[in-house]
UniProtKB/Swiss-Prot annotation:
Name of the molecule in the record: Phosphoglucosamine mutase
Post-translation changes: Activated by phosphorylation.
Species of the source: Helicobacter pylori (strain J99 / ATCC 700824)
Family according to the record: Belongs to the phosphohexose mutase family.
GO molecular function annotations of the record: magnesium ion binding; phosphoglucosamine mutase activity; phosphomannomutase activity
Pfam families listed in its UniProt record: PGM_PMM_I (PF02878), PGM_PMM_II (PF02879), PGM_PMM_III (PF02880), PGM_PMM_IV (PF00408)
GO terms classed as biological process: carbohydrate metabolic process; peptidoglycan biosynthetic process; UDP-N-acetylglucosamine biosynthetic process
Catalytic center residues: S99
Function comment: Catalyzes the conversion of glucosamine-6-phosphate to glucosamine-1-phosphate.
Top enzyme class: isomerase
Cofactor, free-text remark: Binds 1 Mg(2+) ion per subunit.
Length: 445
């Protein structure tokens, strides 16, 4: 049975993520990390979901039962766990979060001792241990060999200092008025402190988590409220984070949502202008707009494509010796400062770019026009191989003949089919998207 999806393990808390399942997974992961153990410590953080307490306690019980010492640091962004795992010299880090999903869901993400997400072969190794009954039941420790757990509440200061270090020393944010939407999630404490300490005039919304309101009509998936607040407050910029703050959505001074591919383009060129790129390559996923590739080429930069998911972006960056890349969804990686997408690092770099451009953000963050794209997330009931659907091959052939770029795939974390189409003719695009929706609804819903 496959346990891991495209971003760790995710499911409905109490249904897939039961205490027994989480304990079993925790033991399996712990036994895997034990093979390369240096410090016998594992770090655990979480977002603000109510079910986080249940998942955390199950993981602590599992890990201490096989002799691991556990450090619990409470609600923190996913990139903070990646950073602190390496900074505090832990064997591994665990983030309890379902990212942008509703509060009923939860998830578990693992990081190695260097703060990187696990590779697929590492996840498969954990799955093999998960299904090995004899190994699991022979691994419990007794007496003094049982591990301990302690909660540390002041590590937030390390991450805040790290974030401030990523911001150019010759700049401050005193000239910027900024609205932050923390999605009632993991960034609700960190984000306001960082921007205030760097001098910004800050307004914060959706920073009162109650365990059930994470991502609820707010944050990166629902930036309309942020857009309204930016216009009302006459702010220079607005930043919306998702539940675990590894994703960023930017709103300009006019209240417009800045497309993720435009962010990748303008930030890549900005990094080049500072001689901060380690290579002439920028990494993005196969969902990126063709206009991004053309814009980067005009600036003597090469776009490298990879599979969808920020861990694949990170792997592709390492392979190409690149230190900048991301997804149009808002997962953007500055690997000099973060091993995974970090919404706060990205927000600070966007702020620096706007300051140094001496332009309003609606101009500074609008470097090129995009080709028309349409993205639909279709709720489905089943996930058979797409190639097995009657008429699917003919459908793709027709799209190719019409020069419509297409990317059709199942979500790795939800029961959804993601359909992306891109073409120069917007009316044709809309017509074909409707045809595709009807085709897949008839066979998958």
């Amino acid at each position: 049975m496959k346990i891991f999806g495209t971003d760790g393990v995710r499911g409905k808390a109490g249904v897939k993520l039961t205490p027994m399942f989480v304990m079993r997974l925790g033991i399996a992961a712990g036994l895997y990390f034990k093979k390369h153990s240096q410090t016998n410590k594992i770090l655990i953080g979480k977002d603000t979901r109510k079910s986080g307490y249940m998942v955390e306690n199950a993981l602590v019980s599992a890990l201490t039962s096989i002799g691991y010492n556990v450090i619990q640091i409470g609600p923190m962004p996913t990139p903070a766990i990646a950073f602190l795992t390496e900074d505090m010299r832990c064997d591994a880090g665990i983030m309890i979060s379902a990212s942008h999903n509703p509060f009923e869901d939860n998830g578990i993400k693992f990081f190695n001792s260097y703060g990187y997400k696990l590779k697929e072969e590492e996840e498969r190794a954990i799955e093999e241990i998960f299904h090995d009954e004899e190994l699991l039941h022979s691994s419990y420790k007794v007496g003094e060999s049982v591990g301990s757990a302690k909660r540390i509440d002041d590590v937030i200061g390390r991450y805040i200092a790290h974030l401030k270090h990523s911001f150019p020393k010759h700049l401050n944010l005193q000239k910027l008025r900024i609205v932050l939407d923390t999605a009632n999630g993991a960034a609700y404490k960190v984000a306001p402190v960082v921007f205030s300490e760097l001098g910004a005039d800050v307004l914060v919304i959706n920073d009162e988590p109650n365990g059930c309101n994470i991502n609820e009509q707010c944050g990166a998936l629902h930036p309309n409220q942020l857009s309204q607040e930016v216009k009302k407050y006459r702010a220079d910029l607005g930043f919306a984070f998702d539940g675990d703050a590894d994703r960023l959505v930017v709103v300009d001074n006019l209240g417009n949502i800045v497309h993720g591919d435009k962010l990748l383009g303008v930030l890549g060129v900005y990094q080049k202008s500072k001689n901060a790129l380690s290579s002439q390559a920028v990494v993005a996923t196969s969902m990126s707009n063709l206009a991004l590739k053309e814009y980067l080429k005009s600036q003597d930069l090469e776009l490298k494509h990879c599979a969808i998911g920020d861990k694949f972006v990170s792997e592709c960056m390492r392979l190409n010796k690149a230190n900048f890349g991301g997804e149009q969804s808002g997962h953007i990686i500055f690997s000099d400062y973060a091993k995974t997408g970090d919404g706060l690092v990205c927000a600070l770099q966007v702020s620096a770019l706007v300051l140094e451009s001496k332009l309003v953000s609606s101009i500074a963050l609008n470097p090129f026009e995009l080709y028309p794209q349409s993205l639909v997330n279709l709720n489905i009931q089943k996930k058979p191989p797409l190639e097995s659907l009657k008429g699917y091959s003919a459908l793709l052939k027709e799209l190719d003949q019409l020069e419509i770029r297409h990317l059709i795939r199942y979500s790795g974390t939800e029961n959804k089919l993601r359909i992306l189409l891109e073409a120069k003719d917007e009316k044709l695009l809309e017509s074909k998207m409707q045809e595709l929706k009807e085709f897949f609804e008839g066979q998958l819903c």
